A protein has these predicted regions:
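Membrane-integrated ABC transporters
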Residues: 1-31, 36, 44-59, 65, ...
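Helix-loop-helix
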Residues: 48, 147-161, 231-305, 309-310
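An intracellular "coupling" helix at the cytosolic face of ABC transporter transmembrane type-1 domains
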Residues: 98-102, 118-127, 131, 135, ...
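Short intracellular "coupling" helices and adjacent cytoplasmic loop segments at the cytosolic face
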Residues: 45-47, 76, 82, 90-114, ...
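Transmembrane helices of ABC transporter permease
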Residues: 10, 14-27, 62, 68, ...
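ABC-type nucleotide-binding domain
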Residues: 325-582
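Hydrophobic alpha-helical transmembrane bundles that constitute the permease/transmembrane domains
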Residues: 23-31, 64-71, 123-126, 130-142, ...
Length: 582
């Protein structure tokens, strides 16, 4: 929890006022047994109704003051816990925004969701109970023991012996509970990851009739979570009964010892009543402490998991502004670039190996190759979604690791393979990167992306609502909206990562023709599976198993690149290859 102390500081007033009000409540609660003893000794035994009446009224007033103090504590504790929880959740969200793809891969999205929700709630709950129960219980415990000892030292020693036993039991339970709560949170991560994955791929599950299989997989992880929760709950379940048993044994012992004392008038009846009340307060306080310490054990696990995220240094470090001239995207070069996801420099772990090429403004660079060749990984290095393991990517003479991320990414437009759309209108999705875009600009890029006609036919046009992840749109429609979104920001470097795979040949042809006039001032990268998508590019890079095995124009590659010839032959047939060679 020490790493999260900084989130408490802004709400120090609530953190102080809450316990302060609780101290008043404890003080009033400690008065009640004394007042009860006075009523019994001087009112009931002496048969003085006036004492009973006036002392009874005083007890009611004390109870009301205790109530007011308790409510005040609850209000301040709630405000502190809710605000602290909100700040931690926001800090986690902001931290995740700084993560590279590699950092997100490390934690897994399901685990990050658990940390931002369930773990924050655990810490939030701890703050609440700490400002209430963890103040009330120790103070009431100490106060009750002191009052009991002052009333009767011998009886008080019985109470102290009982407390030592209870504390020993509590330490044992705490020692075994911490690792169990840690395992529960890990199992919850697995459940959330499975749910998220299943919901994201529900259409695939249904299409392949895999509901039964997925249900079984969920059953296994859910069962693991349930069993871990049951094991942890056993310690919680043992806590209260054991404490209650020891408390009752203590009360019986006190009554057995004090009974003869009352008969001999060595102890007044009212004092015995007050003493038993103090014993009950002390022991119930310890039970409360044990319950709260279980919360502490559980929250410590959550706090550590939160701190793991907050203390993670992003694998991609943002560069400071050097005051150099603005990035124009005139020239880009890859120099001996190697990349592996685990930053290993061994050849067998490398996804990309010794990548070298250059491109200048006005050039279109197409990248083609088999699935898994490293095409998408290569272009993801340009906006620093991942960082190179060795070598460098240089834009306008500057290593991109020395360019502030905001400046770098502001000049790069990327249409990802997965055309992700946000919940909202089509207009909102197109203007995502330029929220103040004019209507005519939105329509212009939509026309270039060959999506304007489709949008115009919708009942609400550009204000048509898009479902989560664009579920109410086809793959081709989502791709074209994503292309329009990227074109609107007018990037210096345009990256289209297999972004026309869902388009038919005619629509793709129209899109390529419309883009020609727009991208003449850009450096454009096109990743494609189809040769027809990159045949007009000034430079085509052919990739195979993480390396560039060919570079040149379409005609040059047909003449000297075996891999390119194989791809061409698989798509167009032997006759066309022969024809190109004539």
């Amino acid at each position: 929890m020490s790493g999260l102390k900084g989130y408490i500081k802004p709400y120090w007033k609530f953190v102080i006022l809450g316990p302060l009000f609780m101290l008043f409540e404890v003080f009033f609660d400690l008065l009640q047994p004394r007042l009860a003893a006075y009523i019994v000794n001087n009112g009931v035994v002496e048969r003085d109704f006036n004492v009973i009446e006036y002392t009874g009224i005083l007890m009611v007033l004390v109870a009301l003051l205790s109530l007011i103090a308790g409510v005040g504590c609850n209000i301040f504790a709630s405000r502190a816990s809710q605000n602290i929880g909100g700040d931690i959740r926001e800090a986690l969200y902001k931290k995740v925004q700084t993560f590279s793809f590699q950092d997100i891969d490390k934690f897994k999205s399901g685990s990050l969701i658990t940390r931002m929700t369930n773990d924050v709630v655990q810490v939030q709950t701890l703050v609440q109970v700490a400002l209430q129960g963890l103040v009330r219980a120790p103070c009431l415990l100490i106060g009750s023991v002191i009052m009991a000892l002052l009333m009767n030292l011998r009886l008080g020693l019985i109470l102290l012996g009982t407390l030592v036993v209870l504390i020993g039991v509590l330490i044992v339970l705490m020692r075994f509970s911490y690792p169990l709560f840690s395992k529960v949170q890990q199992k919850l991560d697995m459940v959330n990851t499975r749910i998220q994955e299943n919901l994201a791929g529900i259409r695939v599950v249904k299409a392949f009739v895999r509901s039964g299989y997925e249900t079984k997989r969920f059953h296994n992880v859910n069962r693991g979570y349930t069993q871990s929760s049951i094991k942890a709950s056993r310690f919680i379940a043992l806590n209260a009964p054991i404490m209650t048993l020891i408390m009752n044994v203590c009360l019986v012992g006190i009554l057995l010892y004090s009974g003869p004392l009352v008969w001999r008038d060595s102890v007044k009846v009212g004092d015995l009543v007050a003493f038993i009340n103090y014993v009950a307060q002390a022991l119930s306080s310890l039970i409360m402490v044990s319950g709260r310490l279980m919360d502490v054990s559980r929250a410590n696990v959550s706090a550590q998991r939160i701190q793991d995220v907050l203390s993670t240094e992003p694998s991609i470090v943002d560069a400071k502004s050097e005051g150099k001239s603005a990035l124009l995207g005139e020239h880009i070069s890859f120099k001996h670039v190697n990349f592996s996801y685990n930053n290993s420099k061994t050849a067998e772990d490398s996804i990309l190996r010794d990548i070298n090429f250059e491109a200048s403004r006005g050039e279109t660079v197409a990248i083609i190759g088999s699935t898994g060749a490293g095409k998408s990984t290569l272009v993801q290095l340009i906006p620093r979604l991942y960082d190179v393991t060795s070598g460098s990517v240089v834009i306008d003479g500057r290593d991109i690791r020395n360019i502030p991320l905001a400046e770098l990414r502001h000049n790069i437009g990327m249409v990802l393979q997965d055309s992700f759309l946000f919940t909202g209108s089509i207009r909102d999705n197109i203007s995502l990167g330029k929220v103040d875009a004019k209507e005519e600009d939105i329509i212009e890029v939509a026309k270039i992306a060959q999506v304007h006609d489709f949008i115009s036919k919708l009942p609400h046009g550009y204000d048509t609502k898009v479902g989560q992840k664009g579920v109410n749109l086809s793959g081709g429609q989502k791709q074209r909206i994503s292309i329009a979104r990227t074109l609107l920001i007018k990037p210096s470097i345009l990256i289209m990562d297999d972004s026309t795979s869902a388009l038919d040949s005619e629509t793709e042809r129209k899109l390529r023709n419309a883009l020609k006039g727009l991208i003449k001032d850009n450096i454009t990268f096109i990743i494609a599976q189809r040769i027809s998508s990159c045949i007009d590019a000034e430079k085509i890079l052919v990739m195979d198993e993480g390396t560039i095995v060919g570079s040149g124009t379409h005609q040059e590659l047909l003449e000297n690149c075996t891999v390119y010839q194989d791809i061409y032959r698989s798509q167009f047939g032997e006759r066309e290859v022969s024809y190109e060679h004539k």
